[in-house]
């Protein structure tokens, strides 16, 4: 495909925007290509600046579960903007969306709207610290919870005692309060708690890890975290920014039957507009200002356009058979890609939960960050580029989740599988 216009725009962008993009993964660095600049999208397709169209499995990194430009959402937002785009004051729309979220998500009794997933997770952690009077937190290697300083930490040789900053600009004094365990490893969690008795405010986890590819929780893992937190007086936070309303209407906590103390949300609840939320038990949430002393605020929190898009999106998700249809489509795609690799004799380890999926370029089981890193990232990059040439837009990183939307039909799924057969055979 010809992408001269995208290349020209990328050159221009690098003069004015660091790295030419406003979020690092968009630069396509890990797949050895220049990024596509997108000018429009509809349904399950996106169109770049050179008028090439692609079947989209990124979906703006998860929000577009309905597909792009769903007419009902678009019309609702058009009506809303005619009344004003931002007020900095309470609206009835906030109450409506809050009620819908509370009705859907088992753990949420009260909810605070914010403007991003990062804002939601950092605020939830602050609130957990205020609630418990403790400073340290536990996260999991390979789980991403936004770019707040306390969360840009990974495991190192000394991580059982102190966190190690994962980015320049993160003070060691901030990072030392973030302890890192291994996903799907309860023993690593128990060890950290034993070494930091009565100091852990919260454990934050993606119930389905979606930022090291797609890695489901092992049997008993989430239940074990719930039990540990109950016995140690620790707040359990599920980061459902990605999984919320994606793997089930009530999120991963509905799917797996494990209820955390707090939940963070984003992506889908804004219908494609910037949004985030965090909620949980009333006795925790009531500590949030102005009803309590834990401070959190935001100029655009509860933005009426985002609330409108979220309300309309959640209404559509309640349609009879919505998640069953999404599951059927997603299963067909994942099975087809797996069969394509098998037919070509190419080793992969496929994972999927609902409409989240990943094709790991390894023959090994992937259950955590160390096993995810055994993947052949160069082979994935080659596969990505070949698929892109065939009009298939996958997540431009081995360690990102891909998404299916309700707008994907049998036609797009079959075209994707045919392309995968050809590309695996060419590797």
Curated annotation (Swiss-Prot):
It catalyses: (S)-4-amino-5-oxopentanoate = 5-aminolevulinate. The modification N6-(pyridoxal phosphate)lysine is found at residue 267. Pathway: Porphyrin-containing compound metabolism; protoporphyrin-IX biosynthesis; 5-aminolevulinate from L-glutamyl-tRNA(Glu): step 2/2. GO terms for cellular component: cytoplasm. Transmembrane segments: none annotated. The keyword Hydrolase does not apply. Keywords: Cytoplasm, Isomerase, Porphyrin biosynthesis, Pyridoxal phosphate. It is found in: Cytoplasm. Its cofactor is pyridoxal 5'-phosphate. Its main location: cytoplasm. Its EC number is 5.4.3.8. GO terms for molecular function: glutamate-1-semialdehyde 2,1-aminomutase activity; pyridoxal phosphate binding; transaminase activity. One of its GO terms (biological process) is protoporphyrinogen IX biosynthetic process. The keyword Coiled coil does not apply. Belongs to the class-III pyridoxal-phosphate-dependent aminotransferase family. HemL subfamily. PANTHER family: GLUTAMATE-1-SEMIALDEHYDE 2,1-AMINOMUTASE, GLUTAMATE-1-SEMIALDEHYDE 2,1-AMINOMUTASE 1, CHLOROPLASTIC-RELATED. NCBIfam families: hemL, PRK00062.1. Homodimer. This is Glutamate-1-semialdehyde 2,1-aminomutase. The gene is hemL.
């Amino acid at each position: 495909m010809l992408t001269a216009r995208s290349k020209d725009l990328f050159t221009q962008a690098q003069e004015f925007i660091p790295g030419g993009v406003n979020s690092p993964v968009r630069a396509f660095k890990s797949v050895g290509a220049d990024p596509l600049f997108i000018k429009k999208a509809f349904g399950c397709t996106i169109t770049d600046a050179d008028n090439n169209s692609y079947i989209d499995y990124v979906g703006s990194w998860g929000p577009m579960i309905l597909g792009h430009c769903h007419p009902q959402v678009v019309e609702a937002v058009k009506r809303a903007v005619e009344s004003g785009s931002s007020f900095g004051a309470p609206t009835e729309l906030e109450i409506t969306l809050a009620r819908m979220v509370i009705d859907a998500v088992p753990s949420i009794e009260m909810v605070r709207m914010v403007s991003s997933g990062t804002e939601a997770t950092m605020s939830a952690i602050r609130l957990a610290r205020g609630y418990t009077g403790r400073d340290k937190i536990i996260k999991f290697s390979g789980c991403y919870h936004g770019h707040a300083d306390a969360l840009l930490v990974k495991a190192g040789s000394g991580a059982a005692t102190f966190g190690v900053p994962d980015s320049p600009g993160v003070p060691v004094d901030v990072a030392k309060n973030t302890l890192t365990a291994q996903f799907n490893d309860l023993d690593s969690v128990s060890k950290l708690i034993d070494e930091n008795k009565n100091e852990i405010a919260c454990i934050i986890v993606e119930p389905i890890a979606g930022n090291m590819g797609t890695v489901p929780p092992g049997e008993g893992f989430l239940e074990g975290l719930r039990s540990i937190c109950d016995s140690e007086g620790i707040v359990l936070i599920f980061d459902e920014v990605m999984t919320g309303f994606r793997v089930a209407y009530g999120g991963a906590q509905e799917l797996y039957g494990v209820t955390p103390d707090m939940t963070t949300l984003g992506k889908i609840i804004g219908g494609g507009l910037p949004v985030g939320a965090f909620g949980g038990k009333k006795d925790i949430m009531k500590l949030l200002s102005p009803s309590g002393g834990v401070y959190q605020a935001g100029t655009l929190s509860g933005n009426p356009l985002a609330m409108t898009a979220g309300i309309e999106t959640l209404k559509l998700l309640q349609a009879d058979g919505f998640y069953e249809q999404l599951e059927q489509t997603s299963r067909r795609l994942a099975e087809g890609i797996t069969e394509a690799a098998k037919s070509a004799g190419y080793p992969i380890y496929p994972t999927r939960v609902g409409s989240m999926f990943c094709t790991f370029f390894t023959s090994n089981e992937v259950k955590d960050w160390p096993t995810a890193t055994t993947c052949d990232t160069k082979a994935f990059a080659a596969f990505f580029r070949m698929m892109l040439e065939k009009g298939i837009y996958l997540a431009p990183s081995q360690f990102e989740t891909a998404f299916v939307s309700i707008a994907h039909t049998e036609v797009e799924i079959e075209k994707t599988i045919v392309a995968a057969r050809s590309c695996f055979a060419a590797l």
